[in-house]
Amino acid sequence: MKDILLETGGPKPSSEEWLKKAKQSDDSNKIGMYLVHNGVVRSTSKSSVYEGNPAKEVCGMLFTADKDKAEDAIKNTLLLDGVYYVRVWMADGKLAPGDDIMQVLIGADIRSHCVDALTSLVGKLKNNCVEEKEIK
């Protein structure tokens, strides 16, 4: 099994540095595409974005991550066809609009595997591994 590359808290790491390290990984010769997701806190509430409900503007967020669940999600992503590299950083604590919530890097053999893996992992992290409480 590949190393589980998960970090939480502290400042968001450089995606450029992550890419440099990914390109030096043991399986880098099998990787044809890297994708990075950088989620940030927005000032619009989830209910106004997803449901169209008028809502008070968000002035912050309390964000916590369950590392064990996140590690399981990463392990499962590494089992997907063509996925050879996964790295995740998630914030911790009180965040303001514009602050980074998470960064995810996926390395896979072809575009469709990379896009599918990124979409799947970010969905699992957001829906199953973190708690986001909007501050209004």
Segments predicted by a language model, with ranges:
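N-terminal, polar/charged subdomain of small-to-medium soluble alpha/beta proteins
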Residues: 1-100, 107-136
